[in-house]
Curated annotation (Swiss-Prot):
Main location: cytoplasm
Name used for this protein in its record: Transaldolase
Keyword Plastid: no
Function recorded in the entry: Transaldolase is important for the balance of metabolites in the pentose-phosphate pathway.
Membership in a protein family: Belongs to the transaldolase family. Type 1 subfamily.
GO cellular component, one term: cytosol
Reactions that this protein is recorded to catalyse: D-sedoheptulose 7-phosphate + D-glyceraldehyde 3-phosphate = D-erythrose 4-phosphate + beta-D-fructose 6-phosphate
EC number per UniProt: 2.2.1.2
Top-level taxon: Bacteria
Length: 316
């Protein structure tokens, strides 16, 4: 019998959640996703040193202002790494907008357009890139405009049904609902242990997947942030799953049978009325888990972005 990774690839598109090109070569995913934390990790890999040098050298030609050079070097590094990864994946790379812009729609638009321009200058067409932004109201509204410009988006740090509903209605290309971080919150909050079936993160993604299929939304559901392969197995059949190299390795070594869990319905119903900004904000406020995890996720990505920038600043 084939291993669970091979079986999973039969009904779910596998995405590698890493900036490590060696890992990508090992697992042959369709796509890859990066974020500020993964970029920070990648920057510490010795083989990536030339990419940092290249980004810094380029930034020096763009501005005489040190602070601007740091920002430019960060953008360029993300694009250099993304371009390199695209040599090994047939699909797309997800590159994240600076998390510090999560509540600024116009700044998110400007940063996204800049990243796409840098990719296009590097010979990478926009149809191979997904721009990642946090699923704040402002991030979702920015994505709605970007989609109209032919810039596809991946809305991340998604923890609630309200976020998923708003993303679908905005026509975003793809969402990344988090699984493991939801489980973390509930375990800490309730003190309970959960099985793969009762895992609140699995339940959340299953509900979102079924809702999207039931209403005919085209937005791709890509489960993210996994703590164990049990969560992945429960979401077998999801449109895409983005998985870290260590869990991809576990799936590859497991020769057991994998059963498909998620299937699209054929009974499509009309979509409900669109969620308003007030209703979105209220739903988020009512959901302590989603509010806390979204805030924490943005803070952590911003902190890692600052650490990466300190490294780049020291090179300027």
């Amino acid at each position: 019998m084939s291993n669970k990774l091979s079986q999973l690839k039969e009904f779910t598109t596998i995405v590698a959640d890493t900036g490590d090109i060696t890992a990508i070569k090992d697992f042959l995913p369709q796509d890859a996703t990066t974020n500020p934390s993964l970029m920070l990790k990648a920057a510490q890999i010795p083989e990536y040193a030339p990419f940092l040098d290249q980004a810094v050298a380029w930034a020096k030609t763009q501005s005489n202002d040190k602070d601007q050079q740091v920002l430019d070097a960060g953008d360029k590094l993300a694009v250099i790494v993304g371009t390199e990864i695209l040599k090994y994946v047939p699909g797309r790379i997800s590159t994240e907008v600076d998390a510090r812009l999560s509540f600024d729609k116009e700044a998110t638009l400007a940063k996204a357009r800049k990243l796409i321009a840098l990719y296009e200058e590097a010979g990478v067409s926009r149809d191979r890139v997904l721009i990642k932004a946090a699923s704040t109201w402002e991030g979702i509204k920015a994505a709605e405009e970007l989609e109209k410009e032919g810039i596809n988006c991946n809305l991340t740090l998604l923890f609630s049904f309200a976020q998923a509903q708003a993303c679908a209605e905005a026509g975003v290309y793809l969402i990344s609902p988090f699984v493991g971080r939801i489980l973390d919150w509930y375990k800490k909050s309730t003190g309970q242990e959960y099985t793969a079936e009762t895992d609140p993160g699995v339940v959340s993604v299953t509900e979102i997947y079924n809702y999207y299929k039931q209403h005919g939304y085209q937005t791709v559901v890509m489960g993210a942030s996994f703590r164990n392969i049990g969560e992945i197995e429960q979401l077998a059949g999801c449109d895409r799953l983005t998985i870290s190299p260590n869990l991809l390795e576990e799936l590859k070594k497991d020769e057991g049978k994998l059963e498909r869990k998620l299937l699209p319905t054929t009974d499509v119903k009309a979509a409900p009325a669109a969620i308003t900004e007030a209703a979105f904000r209220w739903a988020m406020n009512e959901d302590a888990m989603a509010t806390e995890k979204l805030s924490e996720g943005i803070r952590n990505f911003a902190a890692d972005q600052r650490k990466l920038e300190e490294t780049l600043r020291s090179m300027l």
